[in-house]
Amino acid sequence: ALMDYIGEFQKVNIISGKYKEISEALTDRLGRGVTILYGEGAYKGNETKVIYVVVSRLEIAKLKGVVHGFDENALISIGSVEVTGKGHGKKAIH
């Protein structure tokens, strides 16, 4: 059913040197809260920032457009997630 589809959330991890610009744009354009995680590359040990955001399935295409507008080579990892807790309720679809 369409309502089931709209309610499905996706967790997205994004790795890019342009993490500041991307995270600000995701907040402004998608209206979603963004978390910056601190990571380390296993091979070289380089410190890296990872953007973590939860969006609906219907927002994935827009998210990719925003990210690739800043960094075409950004690593984007997407997976299904069940979300509970304050601030992660259903969002109106326009």
Task: Label every PLM stretch briefly.
Residues 1-94:
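Positively charged, small/polar-rich N-terminal and surface patches that mediate targeting and assembly
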